[in-house]
Amino acid sequence: MASNNLNVLNALDTAHTQWYHVTAVVIAGMGFFTDAYDLFCISTISKLLGRLYYYDPHTHAPGKLPHTVNNWVTGVALVGTLTGQLVFGWLGDKLGRKKVYGLTLILMVICALSSGLSFGYSRKVVIGTLCFFRFWLGFGIGGDYPLSATIMSEYANKRTRGAFIAAVFAMQGVGIIFAGLVLMTVSKVFLMRYAGKAFSTDEVFSTEPEADYVWRIVLMLGALPALLTYYWRMKMPETGRYTAIIEGNAKQAAIDMGKVLEIEIQAEGEKLAKFKSANDYSLLSNEFFQRHGLHLIGTMSTWFLLDIAFYSQNLTQKDIFPTMGLVSDAKSISALREMFETSRAMFVIALLGTFPGYWFTVFFIEKIGRFKIQLMGFFMMSIFMAIIGVRYDYLKTKDHKWTFAALYGLTFFFANSGPNSTTFVLPAELFPTRVRSTCHALSAASGKAGAMVSAFGVQQYTQDGEVHKIKKAMLFLAFTNMVGFCCTFLVTETKGRSLEEISGEDENQNETKMKGRPVSGGHQDDGWD
């Protein structure tokens, strides 16, 4: 059937992959680079902060952040991210994607630098100031989620759209690798010059005074990538879909996208008026609920469930690694040595499990499809977490630490090659232009709500490192993944279709309309029957 789409939208959908697609991935991905860098670093830094600021000589044990303080240090950025997602997602639909896009990077740069400058006359002031700036860092990072996903989906062609959106998200993998290298390099440099004694030998000076500079340098370096891409982000034009469909300026959309694609595009004023009038419904309307209600429930629920498991893995790595035997006992090493060993273990797990998973999705999402990849990821994560939970006593012994590490790494691989990527991609494709950024924001905010369950619930539960608690936590995470597997059936496959065809905006077949067919069967659309 012939498409009712505008010329400018058809040109975007059928364009060959060009250099601007690659530059858009890098420019849009810097927020996720910073997000992953911060998440990776803070888990390790929180242990160092405990040794620096919370040493109690009466306990004869290395300093450790109190549960509540640790939860806020690691979790406050998640609260900021959730808030930023909702605010900037809504602004992206109301004011335009580009108008608020630069502000997110400015927030990231300022707050990353300020986090490293969290000085004070007491530990309460230092931690309080750090949490304040980490909230606003998260606020900026959160704004990048809906804006970057929406911009990339509206720029890309329909044949490779999923791969490019996934590539934006895969910049998290690059951020993780960079964070690991920075942590290891900075801590090693200070170790070479200021190495302290083991805690068992000297309780006070096993925590090197110079270590107070280490965590500050690491946090401040997170501002560098965002700063380097600010100029190029400001040079990007507004997306053709927003300019044409929302602003109603077909001529400007044709000019902007013509420059990007290096072709001439004819504007269609009369056709645009009909196009706009057929799709003028709001997020809270019955029309939206009939077309996309279950899809929104599906994207929100799967992201929520995924992030409970995913952030629990990331935030509790520092506690699980000693049990796995990948990090020395805290009493046998100095503070900087502990930081180096923890970051090294996290780096190896990320390099072998997390990083390949992101790029597996980039290369195979257009071949396998979003729906199948998400189902596979949830299912395999559940299996491996259940094995760890059931056999934890066996796996935690020294003789089986590498089996433990392999199983733990595989959960990261299938998270990133599955739902961690697809839950980001699908909300950028399923919903109409008028509410695309807002719907992605709602889905992403649900994910961060799950991450907060992890930070303030699962992490606190396992912080003591007690075996029976870690076993129960892993089995709980296995269960949440199976629920995510079931909720995946609420979304539909989007592979190979234009955004307007998926959302029904071009009025061809209104394929996502749900009257008389509650689930627009991802399994049916994807040929599973």
From Swiss-Prot:
Glycans are attached at N314, N510. It is found in: Cell membrane. GO terms for molecular function: symporter activity. It catalyses: phosphate(in) + H(+)(in) = phosphate(out) + H(+)(out). Residues 43-71, 121-124, 185-211, 313-344, 396-405, 494-529 are extracellular. It comes from the Eukaryota. This is Low affinity inorganic phosphate transporter 5. It comes from Petunia hybrida. The lineage of its organism: Eukaryota, Viridiplantae, Streptophyta, Embryophyta, Tracheophyta.
